């Protein structure tokens, strides 16, 4: 299991032109090989009149399903360079299709490699990329004297507070990276002189993008 990994939150498209040939990159999050293949077929139907629809996908946190295709371009000039970009960006669970409308001018081997690589980079630039972290939700129950200390610890460690409930006591739900669980438990226990009750609720992946918290099962 990866403690952290980069993936797509929202796919995008990017387009470049090289010697009158148009290269359109379509990017999508995929969490199974079936999803990847369906996306490829969907894109081929959308751009049915294009000369080439080259693709790459990498599915699984151990890259169990990683494939690429030149789709009629000279061997090694499209799919492999596209895969190199994905691996270089360290992205998981992603599929990219680069559609080429031929402009009548041959690009040569080096030109094709550069064009397909650049198209993928452009597509990724127009996508929302996140880093998912493996973590837990930690329920913290305390009296009112402990609130300030817990809020300070959460703020100092940049730990999101998902929910707070105020009755005769305070119940806060914290989103804690798994690698920091022990340190956070210790800090809260010491900071409240042992008055806070800590309960681990669930394990999950999460990401924070532009201050917004996103929760995931995987």
Show where each model-derived region lies.
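Structural motif
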Residues: 26, 53-55, 93-96, 137-139, ...
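A common structural junction motif
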Residues: 47-50, 157-162, 189-197
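Short glycine-/aliphatic-rich beta-strand segments at the starts of folded cytosolic domains
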Residues: 128-144
């Amino acid at each position: 299991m990866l403690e952290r990994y980069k993936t797509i939150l929202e796919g995008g498209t990017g387009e470049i032109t090289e010697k009158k040939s148009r290269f359109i990159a379509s990017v999508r999050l995929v969490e199974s090989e079936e999803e990847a293949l369906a996306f490829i077929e969907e894109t081929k139907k959308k751009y049915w009149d294009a000369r080439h629809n080259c693709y790459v996908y990498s599915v699984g946190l151990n890259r169990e399903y990683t494939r690429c295709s030149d789709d009629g371009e000279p061997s090694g000039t499209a799919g492999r360079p596209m895969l190199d970009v994905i691996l270089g960006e360290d992205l998981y669970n992603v599929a990219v299709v680069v559609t080429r409308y031929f402009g009548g001018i041959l690009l040569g081997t080096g030109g094709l490699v550069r064009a397909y690589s650049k198209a993928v980079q452009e597509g990724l630039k127009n996508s929302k990329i996140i880093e998912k972290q493996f973590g837990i939700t930690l329920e913290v129950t305390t009296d009112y004297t402990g609130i300030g200390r817990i809020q300070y610890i959460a703020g100092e460690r940049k730990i999101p507070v998902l929910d707070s409930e105020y009755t005769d006591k305070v119940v806060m739900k914290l989103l804690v990276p798994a690698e920091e669980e022990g340190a956070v438990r210790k800090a809260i226990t010491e900071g409240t002189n042992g008055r806070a009750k800590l309960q681990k609720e669930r394990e999950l992946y999460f990401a924070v993008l532009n201050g917004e918290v996103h929760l995931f099962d995987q």
